[in-house]
From Swiss-Prot:
EC number: 6.3.4.21
Modifications made to the protein after synthesis: Transiently phosphorylated on a His residue during the reaction cycle. Phosphorylation strongly increases the affinity for substrates and increases the rate of nicotinate D-ribonucleotide production. Dephosphorylation regenerates the low-affinity form of the enzyme, leading to product release.
Reaction(s) the record says it catalyses: nicotinate + 5-phospho-alpha-D-ribose 1-diphosphate + ATP + H2O = nicotinate beta-D-ribonucleotide + ADP + phosphate + diphosphate
UniProt entry keywords in alphabetical sequence: Ligase, Phosphoprotein, Pyridine nucleotide biosynthesis
One GO BP: NAD biosynthetic process via the salvage pathway
Protein name per UniProt: Nicotinate phosphoribosyltransferase
Pathway annotation: Cofactor biosynthesis; NAD(+) biosynthesis; nicotinate D-ribonucleotide from nicotinate: step 1/1
Coiled coil residues, start to end: none
Annotated GO MF terms: nicotinate phosphoribosyltransferase activity
Length: 402
């Protein structure tokens, strides 16, 4: 492949499911909201030299559109309404919304436009960045290398799990955004389907369609971040986001992300009504055992049987960490493990990129993420962070994200 001339992405469905799920909610509720998002490399690598290749790929994305077979596939799922699907059929990526440059060796990317458009850029753009960088750095790597590594991990999993009932272990593929390549992700998931009976789905809609897997995903941090400016009351913004999601999806897609403003602040908003309506919670930062214990205790305090709810773990998981969590919690609550980078970019000699794209403004005003892991905190306005901390009683000193 020539990453300067050959498109990495061949389908608009090659993205995470929750992007379409959120886009539908935005289409119905926040059609005119404007946002800005910014790229960040948490590993502080100098990726600016790849800006030209990434720009070329972004320009090629203007040709992606929902084809008839893909439209029929989405229409057969229980998540989508016809007005949204008809709109998605007309959607085209607009590269003018994306500014990409090499800024003193750093890769600088900013995306600005209507939220309903910007929302679809994040995952495919991150996948493009990852594949461009790895293709340039490690052209000798093959899909066979990735599959061989996966087989080693599956053998190890079987060994460490011999003494435990693993019938309730559930694995999801969350590996699109930081994959080594599209081909590696597709081959790894095909191998899991053949050899790992605990795979229950993928976050990638193209993979789900082509491999006959359930597509899985609910909402991301941006859903809660945008509500910090959409809601007239900052202190009520998280509750407003939770309610708006239920209004859009009253009986499905009910896993709530808990760490936009720390788990403790989330649980204060996640009262009896929300706790009963949502099917469970997703962990994405902080100590996972401590988080899980808090979640179970919260359900018990509300008189809810934890075995009727599900905890999804998705923070930097690998098979060892997932099994440790399964061993700790499996008899007390339902569990699902979303593994991403350690499925789709776990290849000997390859260092995965630690890259994200996050909202920084909504309707021209700042938004913030105050997660349970200091390294995942995203904020660009100290005054707003102070206001957010005060509104949610978060005793955390936040440093500006670089």
């Amino acid at each position: 492949m020539n990453v300067a001339t050959d498109p990495i992405l061949t389908s608009i469905l090659d993205t995470d499911a929750y992007k379409f799920h959120m886009q539908q909610a935005v289409f119905h509720r926040y059609h005119d909201v404007m946002v800005s998002a910014k790229f960040r490399c948490r590993g502080y690598e100098l990726l600016g030299e790849y800006a030209a290749d990434i720009s070329a790929q972004v320009d090629m994305m203007r040709g992606l559109q929902l084809n008839d077979d893909e439209f029929t596939y989405l229409r057969g799922l229980p998540f989508f309404q016809s007005d949204y699907l008809n709109c998605l059929r007309q959607f085209r990526f607009d590269p003018s919304q994306v500014r990409i440059r090499n800024h003193h060796g750093k890769l600088d990317i900013r995306i600005t436009g209507p939220w309903r458009d910007v929302i679809l850029w994040e995952v495919p753009l991150l996948a493009v960045i990852s594949e461009v960088v790895h293709h340039r750095r490690s052209p000798q790597v093959t899909t066979a290398d990735a599959v061989a590594r996966l087989r080693q991990k599956l053998l190890h999993f079987r060994r460490i799990s011999e003494d435990l009932d693993t019938s309730r272990f559930r694995l999801m593929d969350f590996g699109t955004r930081r994959r080594f390549s599209r081909q590696v992700q597709f081959e790894v998931i095909a191998e899991l389907q053949r050899e790992f009976p605990y795979l229950i789905g993928t976050s990638n809609y193209q993979l789900a369609r082509e491999r006959g897997l359930p597509p899985i995903g609910t909402q991301a941090h941006e859903w809660f971040q945008a509500h910090q400016q959409i809601s007239p009351d900052l202190a009520n913004s998280q509750s407003a986001a939770l309610q708006a999601w239920l209004d859009e999806y009253p009986d499905r897609l009910g896993i709530a992300l808990t760490d936009c403003i720390t788990m403790d602040a989330f649980l204060r908003d996640f009262g009896p009504s929300f706790a009963r309506a949502y099917q469970g919670m997703r962990h994405d930062s902080g100590d996972p055992v401590e988080w899980g214990e808090k979640a179970i205790a919260h359900y018990q305090q509300l008189g809810i049987d934890p075995l009727t709810k599900t905890l999804v773990f998705s923070d930097s998981l690998d098979f060892d960490k997932a099994f440790m969590l399964y061993r700790h919690f499996w008899q007390r609550i339902n569990l699902v493990f979303g593994i991403g980078t350690r499925l789709t970019c776990d290849i000997p000699g390859i260092k995965p990129l630690n890259i994200v794209i996050k909202l920084v403004k909504c309707n021209g005003k700042p938004v913030a993420k105050l997660s349970d892991s200091p390294g995942k905190i995203m904020c660009h306005d100290k005054a707003f962070v102070r206001a957010l901390r005060k509104a949610f009683d978060v005793p955390l000193v936040v440093k500006k994200a670089s």
